[in-house]
Amino acid sequence: MNKTPVDIDQEAILLFHDLAEQRDNYARTDEKAGFTVSSEFRHRFFSLLDALNLRLIDDRDNFFGYFLFQADRDLRFQLDSPTGTTFKNGRYTLYFNPYLFLQLTAEQMESAVKHEVLHIL
């Protein structure tokens, strides 16, 4: 089965609108627990990261793509920047604030990932 390549910029716009809608719906509830996104959103977000990772692996600086491939990834809404990194239990975890990350272009997303990896090195 042949999959159509993901247009990262377009998918980021769609995901950002979905995120805003989920946040608006949450704000209209009396829910006391913290805001979380749907499992579908998480799946789509990490699929976008997979597409971005393929771009990094195909790049001449493919080290960054292979690093992202090996690292754990998660969402963290309270980050003050689009990305962040921690090292725990022998593994690196790259965190993404989708509010900030999804507003970047694909090239800026690549730069943000490279920037985080360079912090580690």
Predicted regions and their residues:
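Basic/hydrophobic alpha-helical interface regions
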Residues: 1-113, 117-121
